[in-house]
Swiss-Prot record:
GO terms for molecular function: 3'-5' exonuclease activity; DNA binding; DNA-directed DNA polymerase activity. Required for replicative DNA synthesis. This DNA polymerase also exhibits 3' to 5' exonuclease activity. Keywords: Cytoplasm, DNA replication, DNA-directed DNA polymerase, Exonuclease, Hydrolase, Nuclease, Nucleotidyltransferase, Transferase. It comes from Streptococcus pyogenes serotype M12 (strain MGAS2096). CDD domains: DEDDh (cd06127), PHP_PolIIIA_POLC (cd07435), polC_OBF (cd04484). This is DNA polymerase III PolC-type. Its main location: cytoplasm. GO terms for cellular component: cytoplasm.
C-alpha cells in the first residue's frame, strides 16, 4: 500500500489483520476532494480487487467515526483493478447498497433490498416479483443503484430486472395472509382499547380550562432544534422527505405576488454537491421583509419538507425556517510581505477554456493581500482594459501578459545538412517504438532501420529491447508489440552501439524526425554515447513542403496516396521500410519539380515561407514590463491574428525577437518547449532552450497529473522529479524559477464548470484527445487549476523542502513582480482624428445655414443656442466628430439617399444646421422661407412645431414653415457639454457599404477599423452544454443543478465579431497600437475589414467611433422616391390624410373588419407592430407631439405598461401629459420652475432607472423641489417606476420617416405596397398571395390557430405579417400577379397598372444569385426547355418543378429534343 494510504489507516486505527490482507497490498489514495462549504470529504481509493464485505464495512465505519469527531462528513468510492462477480459477493454488496444514501430511502429499501441478484452475460440480473413497477425502478432508482455499486468497485454495471413468477406467487400469498392477520388483530385491539378507555374514564366533573399553550416556548424549542440539526448534503436527497436542513449559497431568486396578495420566493441554492429548488411563502409585505436575506450570493441554512412540485415535477423544498450564515471563504494565511504572486492566470477571455472574469481574479488576489497578479489569456489580451481599471480600483498591480503560441518561422526539412549529392547518398531510414512519448520517462522497445542506396534496400537493422517491465495494454494495442517479442532481447546499450555503427557515413531519415532523434539522443546521453551528428532528413516536413495541397501528411495517409505497402503501422521495421520507399518518391519529385539535387537545397529552396502554418506550436508566457512593451505586445497580438493566423494566432520566433523590447518571457506550462525538452530530450537540451527565456515556470504537481494518465510521466514521483529537473535547468541556465498556478478558475468547486465548457468542444479539440482506443477511450482528466493561496502553493511544493519551496513560490514571484512597471493600458483622454480647419468649417457651416433659414442677424434664441453649442463642441475638441458625420451624411445624400439620425444627436441644433440630422431641437416655431421672419413658442404649450396651425407670414404673406421639437442640448453632451458625442446614423442598407468605405476614404485605411465585439457563451447555450455533458458522460443532474452548472459555464469567450455599423477611427497623428491590437472578426482571414481586438466599448472614451448603421427606412424612402418622383423632404409632417390613419381605416377605403384592425397602422414603421397598434387604439393620437409620446412610450421600459397606460385609463393624465420621452422630463420641470441643473439631474436619474436606487435623502430633495413647484404626485410616482427612456430626438427622427412612408400608403398605395414587399417583407408564399382574398384569409386563420397553440414557426410568423399587408392591398382593390418567367425582376416587385408582379426571389427556396442568373440568362435568349432553364438559369430541379406546378412555365417541354418534334405535328 502507498505511504499516504498507510497513514490514513493509522489514523482510523484499521485492524492489522485486515491491513495485512492481500486486499490491501496495493491500496492507494487516488484523490481527496474537500468541499469546504458542506464540510464533506470525498476519498477515491484504488485496490487490487473488490474488498470482502466485512473489510469494506469495517473501513466504512472507522472512516465515518474518525472524521465525525472533527465534524466532517466522509464518502468514498473504490476503483478495483480486478472484479469478482461471484453471486455471494454481489448479493452482499447489493444489500449493502441499501444502507447508503440515496438508496436507503424507505420505499426503495423495503421494496428491493431483499431481492436476489446474479451475474449473467455481463449483466447484473435482479429477480423481482411481477407487480414491481419496472419503469419506476429504471427512472427513479436504477441510476442510484448503478452509482453505488460503482462506488463499491464493481465498475459501471448493466442491470436488468426480470420477473420471477415463483416469487410473485409466494409474496402474494404472504401479503394476503398477513393482511388478514392484521385486520383481525386491529379489530381485537380496537375492542380492548374501548374497554380500557371506559375503565379509565373518570367521573364527570366540572370542566376546567386547559393550560394555555406557550407558543413562544415552542418556537424557541423549534429554533434550537434548527440550530443543532444535522446538515444534509443536497446530493443525498432523491425522494420526498420531511424536516431536511440544507446549508448553501443562493444563486437564483425570483419573487412573485399572487392575485390574492400573497408572496412567493422561488430560489435555488447549492452546497456544491448538488443544487436544489426551494420555495418560501409570505402572507403579506411585512412577512416578506423578514426574508430579505434570501438574495443572490447569500449563504443560508434552511429547513423544510422535500416535496414534488406539481408544476415543475421536480423535488422542491418548502422552506419552514431560514437563517443567514457566515461563509468562510478561503484565505491566504501567510503574513504580510510573505505572500506569493500568481503569474499565470486565465480569465474568461481564454476562448472556451477558463471561467473567472478579470475583475473577480483581481478582487480575489487583492482580498488575499497579494501585491500583484498576472493575466495570461491564451493568445489574446481582451481582458486588459477591464483588468487595468479593476486593478487601479483595488489598489493592486496588474501584470499584463498572455500565453502565446510560438512557432519556428521555417521548420527545416534537414538538420545539420552538408554539401552532398542526394542521388549519390546512402540513407539509413529508421523508426523507433517506445512505451510512451517521454524520452526521460519511457523506454525504447524497438529500433528498426533500412539502409538504402538509390532506392534499394542494401541492409536492414531490427532489434527489440526489453524495458524491464511488462508492456501496458495501450502500448501493445498501438504497436502490436507484446511481451513475448521482447523476451531474450539484447540490452539497450548493446543495441544503441550496434545502431550507431549501422548508421555511419549515412544520412539519417525518419518521419517526424524530431521525436525519433530526440529519443535516440536522450538514450545515447544516458549511456555516455555520442549524440547524432550526421545529417537528418525529416520526411514529415519534406512532405508538407513538397505537397502543401495535401491535408494530411502522416505516414498512413502518405503510404495510401503513393501506394506504398504498410502492413503493420506502428511496428518500427514496417514503418522504417515504408518511410524509405516514400523518401525516394519525394527525392524524385523534388528533383523533377523543383530542381533540388543537393542536401543543402532542401532547406534553402524547398522550405516554404509559410511553413510556420504547419509548425508545432509551443507555449510561452509573455509579460509587459513597461509602456514600450505594451505597444510591442499589441503589435505581436495583431501580427499573430492578421498575418500569421493558422487555426490559432501564431507568433513566429523571429517576429517575437523583433518586438521583444519591454517584454519578459516565461517558459509556460507542459506545452512549453523547455518542459517538453526536459521530458523528451534531457536536461542539456532544456538548458540550451531555457537561455532564450527570462524565467522558468514550474507548476503544482496536480497541474501535471494528466501527463501520468497519458503515460508521459509514470507517477507522482515522476512529476516531482520533472519539477526538480526544471529547477536544475534554471540553475544551470542562470534563470530564476517561479512557481505559477496555471489558474483557470478561482475555487476548487468550479472545476466542473470548466469540465463542461472544455468537453463541449468535442474530441476534435486537442485538450479532449482520448486515452485508449475503442469504446473505452476517454479524454485525459483536466488538471486541478484553481487559484491557490500561498499556503496551498507551499504545500504543493513541500517535497522540495521548506526553503526552496518558499524561494520558488514566494520570493522569486515577488522579485519578478517588482520588475514590472506600471503601464497605461487605456488612455485617459479622447484622441480625435485631425481634419484641417475642422473648427472653422463646423462654425461656418452652422452660421451659413442658420442665416439662410432665420436671417442675419439671427433671432436671439437661435444665436444664443448656437453660441452655447459651439462653445462646447469646439472647446472640447468635438468639431472633428461633427464634421466627419456631416461629410458622411452629405456623401450619402449625394448618392440619392436620406440618412436618419438615431439617439440624441437631434438634440444638437448645430447638428441640424450642418445636415447631420433633420430633427430641429429648438422650441416650436414659425419661420418664413422668404423674409426669414420667425415666431417662437417658448411656454411649453405646444409639443411640436409641426402641430402649429398653418398661417401666413405677417410681414410678407408667404405661408410660414413650421418646425421645432423643444429638445435641450444637455441631453446630448451632458449638462456641462463635455460628454463625448455618440453620433448614430441610419444609412440605407443599400448604401451602408459605401458609407463604410467613405470613412476609409476620409481618414485612411490604416486609421479606420470596424468596432470589435467579443461573443461569450450565453446561458441557453451553456444549458445545452450541460445536457450534452450529462448525455456523454453518464451524469444525472436535477433541474436546479443543471441551472447552476449552466450559469457557471456561461460568460466564457466563444468567438469575436464586429459591430454591425460601428467604425473606430484612430487619430492620424498616432497609430492603432497606441490603443488596441487589431484582428479579423471571428478569425475570418478573408474578411475585408479588420476590427479592434478590444471590445469597442473598452476604448470608446478614447477614440472616435462612428455608428454607420443600415436601416430599411432610408431604403424604403429612396424606392418610393424612384417610383413617384416625389422628393420626400417636401412631404408635410401634418398631412390630414396621414393623421387619419391613426384614428380609423376610412382613409384607406376599407372597414376595420376587412383588414382586421381598427386603424390604418399596418406596415407603418414604428407603429405597425401589435404592441404599438394596441397603444394607438387606446390613445387615438391626433398630433405629431402625441406620436412622439407614443414612440417614447413604446421603446421605454416600464414607461407604458403599469405606468402611463394606467394613468390614461383612469383619467389622471392624457397622452399629451404623461412622461413619454426622457427629454420631456427636463423641459417639463424647467417650465414648472425647477432650476435647469436639478431638472437635468432628475431626468438622468429617471431615464437610467436609478430613481429608487439613489439615497432616500437625495430622492426626497428632488421630490420636495417638485412639489414646491406644483408638480403633481402622479408625475413623481411615475418617475419612480421607469427603468429606461427613449430620447425625444430619436423618436422625432423615426416618426418623421414613418409619416413619409404613411404618406405614400394613403396617396400612392400601389407604390407603397411595391416598396413594402420589395424591402420590408421577410417571408412570401406566392401560391397564397396570388390566390385571392379567400386564400389569403384562410392561410391567416390557419397561422392564427397555430399561434394560439404555440405551433407557428418563425417563418409562419413572418409570413402572417406579410399576409396582413397582402390582405389590406387586395381589400383596397389592388391585385397580386403571378411570377412571370420573362417579366419578373430578380429581387424587386414590379408595378403593372393595379397589379404587382412578384420577383423570382419571392419563390421559396430561390436565392438572390439564382434569381439574378435567371434574369441574365433570359436576356441572352428564350428558355426552350426545362433542361435549359436548369442549365442556363441555374435553377434546381426542385425549383423548376415548383415553377411548373404554379403554371409559370406554361407548356415548356422537358428538353429541347421534344420541342423539335413538336413542329411536325
Amino acid at each position: 500500500m502507498s505511504d499516504l494510504f498507510a497513514k490514513l489507516m493509522d489514523q482510523i486505527e484499521m485492524p492489522l489483520d485486515m491491513r495485512r490482507s492481500s486486499a490491501f497490498s496495493s491500496a492507494d489514495i487516488i484523490e481527496v476532494k474537500v468541499h469546504s462549504v458542506s464540510r464533506l470529504w470525498e476519498f477515491h481509493f484504488a485496490f487490487a480487487a473488490v474488498l470482502p464485505i466485512a473489510t469494506y464495512r469495517e473501513l466504512h465505519d472507522r472512516l465515518i467515526r474518525t472524521f465525525e469527531a472533527a465534524d466532517i462528513k466522509v464518502t468514498f468510492d473504490i476503483q478495483a483493478a480486478q472484479v469478482d462477480y461471484s453471486d455471494d459477493l454481489l448479493q452482499a454488496y447489493y444489500q449493502e447498497a441499501f444502507e447508503h444514501a440515496p438508496c436507503n430511502s424507505a420505499s426503495f429499501k423495503s421494496s428491493f433490498s431483499k431481492l436476489k441478484v446474479t451475474y449473467e452475460d455481463d449483466k447484473l440480473i435482479i429477480a423481482a416479483p411481477g407487480f414491481v413497477n419496472n419503469d419506476h425502478f429504471r427512472n427513479n432508482h436504477l441510476p442510484n443503484l448503478v452509482k453505488q455499486l460503482e462506488a463499491f468497485g464493481f465498475g459501471t454495471l448493466t442491470i436488468d430486472m426480470v420477473s420471477d413468477q415463483e416469487m410473485t406467487e409466494h409474496l402474494t400469498k404472504d401479503f394476503v395472509s398477513s393482511r388478514q392477520a392484521l385486520v383481525k388483530k386491529a379489530v381485537q385491539d380496537n375492542l380492548e382499547a374501548q374497554k380500557s378507555l371506559e375503565a379509565m374514564m373518570p367521573p364527570v366533573e366540572e370542566a376546567t380550562p386547559a393550560p394555555k399553550f406557550d407558543y413562544k416556548e415552542r418556537a424557541a424549542k423549534r429554533q434550537a432544534g434548527f440550530e443543532k440539526a444535522t446538515i444534509t448534503p443536497m446530493i443525498e436527497i432523491e425522494t420526498e422527505e420531511n424536516r431536511i436542513v440544507f446549508e448553501g449559497m443562493v444563486f437564483d431568486v425570483e419573487r412573485k405576488t399572487t392575485r390574492t396578495g400573497r408572496h412567493i420566493i422561488n430560489f435555488k441554492m447549492t452546497d456544491y454537491t448538488s443544487s436544489f429548488a426551494l420555495q418560501k411563502w409570505a402572507k403579506d409585505d411585512e412577512e416578506l421583509r423578514k426574508f430579505d436575506m434570501i438574495a443572490k450570493g447569500a449563504w443560508l441554512r434552511v429547513q423544510g419538507n422535500i416535496e414534488t412540485n406539481p408544476f415543475t415535477k421536480s423535488l422542491t423544498m418548502n422552506v419552514q425556517q431560514v437563517k443567514e450564515i457566515v461563509h468562510h471563504d478561503r484565505k491566504d494565511l501567510m503574513p504580510e510581505g510573505q505572500k506569493r504572486v500568481e503569474l499565470h492566470a486565465h480569465t474568461n477571455m481564454s476562448t472556451m477554456d477558463a471561467l473567472p472574469t478579470v475583475e473577480s481574479l483581481i478582487d480575489t488576489a487583492a482580498k488575499w493581500g497579494h501585491k500583484a497578479v498576472a493575466i495570461t489569456d491564451h493568445a489574446n489580451v481582451q481582458s486588459f482594459p477591464h483588468g487595468y481599471h479593476r486593478a487601479r480600483k483595488a489598489g493592486i498591480k496588474a501584470i499584463f501578459g498572455l500565453e502565446a503560441n510560438i512557432v519556428e518561422d521555417k521548420v527545416p526539412i534537414s538538420y545539420d545538412p552538408v554539401d552532398m549529392d542526394l542521388h549519390e547518398a546512402t540513407y539509413v531510414v529508421f523508426d523507433v517504438e517506445t512505451t510512451g512519448l517521454s524520452a526521460m520517462n519511457n523506454d525504447l522497445i524497438q529500433i528498426a532501420a533500412s539502409k538504402m542506396f538509390k532506392g534499394n534496400i542494401v541492409e536492414q537493422f531490427d532489434e527489440f529491447i526489453d524495458p524491464g517491465h511488462p508492456l501496458s495494454a495501450f502500448t501493445t494495442e498501438l504497436t502490436g508489440i507484446t511481451d513475448k517479442h521482447l523476451q531474450g532481447a539484447k540490452p539497450l546499450v548493446t543495441v544503441l552501439k550496434a545502431f550507431q555503427d549501422f548508421c555511419k557515413d549515412s544520412i539519417l531519415v525518419a518521419h517526424n524526425a524530431s521525436f525519433d532523434v530526440g529519443f535516440m539522443n536522450a538514450n545515447y546521453e544516458r549511456h555516455d554515447l555520442p549524440k547524432i551528428t550526421q545529417p537528418v532528413i525529416d520526411t514529415l516536413e519534406f512532405a508538407r513542403n513538397l505537397y502543401p495541397e495535401y491535408k494530411r501528411h502522416g505516414l498512413g495517409p502518405l503510404t495510401k496516396r503513393f501506394q506504398v505497402s504498410l502492413d503493420h503501422h506502428h511496428m518500427a521495421n514496417y514503418d522504417a521500410e515504408a518511410t524509405g520507399r516514400l523518401l525516394f518518391i519525394f527525392l524524385r519529385d523534388a528533383r523533377e519539380k523543383h530542381g533540388i539535387k543537393n542536401l543543402l537545397q532542401l532547406n534553402t529552396d524547398l522550405v516554404a515561407e509559410d511553413s510556420y502554418k504547419k509548425a508545432r506550436i509551443k507555449h510561452a508566457t509573455i509579460y509587459v514590463q513597461n509602456q514600450v512593451g505594451l505597444k510591442n505586445m499589441f503589435k505581436l497580438v495583431s501580427l499573430s491574428n492578421i498575418k500569421y493566423f493558422e487555426g490559432v494566432p501564431r507568433i513566429p520566433r523571429t517576429v517575437l525577437d523583433a518586438h521583444r523590447e519591454g517584454l519578459l518571457l516565461g517558459t509556460a506550462c507542459s506545452d512549453g518547449e523547455v518542459f517538453d525538452a526536459v521530458l523528451t530530450k534531457g536536461i542539456d537540451a532544456a538548458v540550451d532552450l531555457a537561455k532564450y527565456y527570462d524565467f522558468i515556470e514550474i507548476m503544482p504537481p496536480a497541474i501535471y497529473q494528466p501527463l501520468v494518465v497519458r503515460e508521459l510521466i509514470k507517477d507522482q514521483a515522476g512529476i516531482e522529479q520533472v519539477i526538480r529537473d526544471l529547477i536544475e535547468v534554471g540553475k544551470r541556465a542562470k534563470k530564476p524559477v517561479l512557481a505559477t498556478g496555471n489558474v483557470h478558475y478561482l475555487e476548487p468547486e468550479e472545476e466542473i464548470y470548466r469540465e463542461i465548457i472544455v468537453r463541449s468542444l468535442g474530441q476534435g479539440a486537442m485538450i479532449n484527445r482520448t486515452i485508449g482506443r475503442g469504446e473505452g477511450a476517454q479524454p485525459a482528466p483536466l488538471p486541478k487549476a484553481h487559484f491557490r493561496t500561498t499556503n496551498e502553493m507551499l504545500d504543493e511544493f513541500a517535497f522540495l523542502g521548506k526553503d526552496l519551496a518558499y524561494q520558488v513560490v514566494v520570493q522569486n514571484t515577488q522579485d519578478f513582480a517588482d520588475r514590472i512597471e506600471e503601464v497605461e493600458v487605456v488612455k485617459g483622454d479622447l484622441y480625435t482624428p485631425y481634419i484641417d480647419k475642422a473648427e472653422e468649417t463646423v462654425a461656418e457651416l452652422t452660421y451659413q445655414k442658420a442665416f439662410e433659414i432665420y436671417g442675419n442677424p439671427l433671432p436671439d434664441i437661435i444665436d444664443l443656442r448656437i453660441e452655447k453649442e459651439l462653445t462646447s463642441i469646439l472647446g472640447n475638441g468635438f468639431a472633428v466628430i461633427y464634421l466627419a458625420s456631416q461629410m458622411l451624411v452629405n456623401r450619402s445624400n449625394e448618392r440619392g439617399y436620406l440618412v436618419g439620425s438615431r439617439g440624441s444627436v437631434g438634440s444638437s441644433f448645430v447638428a441640424t444646421m450642418i445636415g447631420i440630422t433633420e430633427v430641429n431641437p429648438m422650441p416650436p416655431h414659425y419661420v418664413c422661407p422668404s423674409c426669414q421672419h420667425s415666431e417662437f413658442i417658448t411656454d411649453g404649450s405646444v409639443g411640436s412645431g409641426y402641430d402649429l396651425p398653418n398661417k401666413p407670414c405677417p410681414k410678407c404673406g408667404t405661408p410660414y414653415q413650421k418646425d421645432g421639437q423643444d429638445i435641450p442640448f444637455e441631453t446630448f453632451l451632458g449638462f456641462d457639454g463635455d460628454k463625448v458625442p455618440d453620433i448614430d446614423l441610419n444609412f440605407s442598407g443599400d448604401d451602408q457599404p459605401s458609407a463604410h468605405l467613405d470613412v476609409r476614404d476620409i481618414f485612411g485605411d490604416e486609421y479606420a477599423f470596424r468596432a470589435g465585439t467579443v461573443g461569450t457563451v450565453a446561458e441557453k447555450t451553456a444549458y445545452g452544454f450541460v445536457k450534452g455533458y450529462e448525455r456523454d458522460y453518464g451524469k444525472f443532474y436535477r433541474d436546479a443543478e443543471v441551472d447552476r452548472l449552466a450559469a457557471g459555464a456561461a460568460g466564457v469567450k466563444r468567438t469575436t465579431g464586429q459591430h454591425p455599423g460601428g467604425i473606430v477611427v484612430i487619430p492620424n497623428y498616432m497609430d492603432v497600437y497606441d490603443f488596441t491590437p487589431v484582428q479579423y472578426p471571428a478569425d475570418d482571414v478573408t474578411a475585408s475589414w479588420q476590427t479592434t481586438h478590444f471590445n469597442f466599448h473598452d476604448i470608446d472614451e478614447n477614440v472616435l467611433k462612428l455608428d454607420i448603421l443600415g436601416h430599411d427606412d432610408p431604403t424604403m424612402i429612396r424606392k418610393l422616391q424612384d417610383l413617384s418622383g416625389i422628393d420626400p423632404i417636401t412631404i408635410p409632417a401634418d398631412d390630414p390624410g396621414v393623421m387619419a390613419l391613426f384614428s380609423g381605416t376610412e382613409i384607406l377605403g376599407v372597414t376595420p373588419e376587412q383588414i382586421g384592425t381598427p386603424t390604418g397602422m399596418l406596415g407603418i414603421p414604428e407603429f405597425g407592430t401589435n404592441f404599438v397598434r394596441g397603444m394607438v387604439n387606446e390613445t387615438h393620437p391626433t398630433t405629431f407631439a402625441e406620436l412622439l409620446q407614443l414612440s417614447g412610450l413604446s421603446h421605454g421600459t416600464d414607461v407604458w405598461l403599469g405606468n402611463a397606460q394606467d394613468l390614461i385609463k383612469e383619467g389622471i393624465a392624457t397622452l399629451k401629459t404623461v412622461i413619454g420621452c426622457r427629454d420631456d422630463i427636463m423641459v417639463y420641470l424647467m417650465h414648472a420652475g425647477l432650476e435647469p441643473k436639478m431638472a437635468f439631474t432628475i431626468m438622468e436619474r429617471v431615464r437610467k432607472g436609478l430613481w429608487l436606487k439613489i439615497s432616500e435623502e437625495e430622492r426626497n430633495g428632488y421630490i420636495d423641489a417638485m412639489r414646491e413647484n406644483n408638480v403633481p404626485d402622479w408625475y413623481i410616482e411615475s418617475c419612480g417606476k421607469i427603468k429606461y427612456m427613449f430620447p425625444k430626438a430619436h423618436a422625432a427622427a423615426y416618426v418623421l420617416m414613418a409619416l413619409r412612408v404613411a404618406y405614400f400608403k394613403v396617396h400612392h398605395p400601389i407604390m407603397y405596397y411595391c416598396a413594402y414587399f420589395s424591402i420590408r417583407a421577410k417571408a412570401f408564399e406566392l401560391k397564397t398571395m396570388s390566390g385571392g382574398l379567400d386564400a389569403v384569409k384562410a392561410r391567416m386563420e390557419d397561422i392564427t390557430i397555430k399561434r394560439k397553440n404555440n405551433e407557428a414557426t418563425n417563418v409562419e410568423n413572418d409570413l402572417f405579417t406579410t399576409l396582413e399587408i397582402v390582405n389590406e392591398m387586395l381589400e383596397r382593390g389592388f391585385k397580386f400577379g403571378k411570377l412571370d418567367l420573362y417579366k419578373s425582376d430578380a429581387i424587386e416587385f414590379q408595378i403593372k397598372g393595379d397589379t404587382l408582379i412578384p420577383p423570382f426571389i419571392a419563390l421559396e427556396g430561390l436565392g438572390e444569385n439564382v434569381a439574378k442568373q435567371i434574369v441574365k440568362a433570359r436576356q441572352e435568349g428564350e428558355f426552350l426547355s426545362k433542361m435549359e432553364l436548369r442549365k442556363r438559369g441555374g435553377a434546381s430541379s426542385t425549383l423548376v418543378e415548383k415553377m411548373d406546378e404554379m403554371s409559370i412555365l406554361g407548356n415548356m417541354p422537358e428538353d429541347n429534343q421534344l420541342s423539335l418534334f413538336d413542329d411536325f405535328f
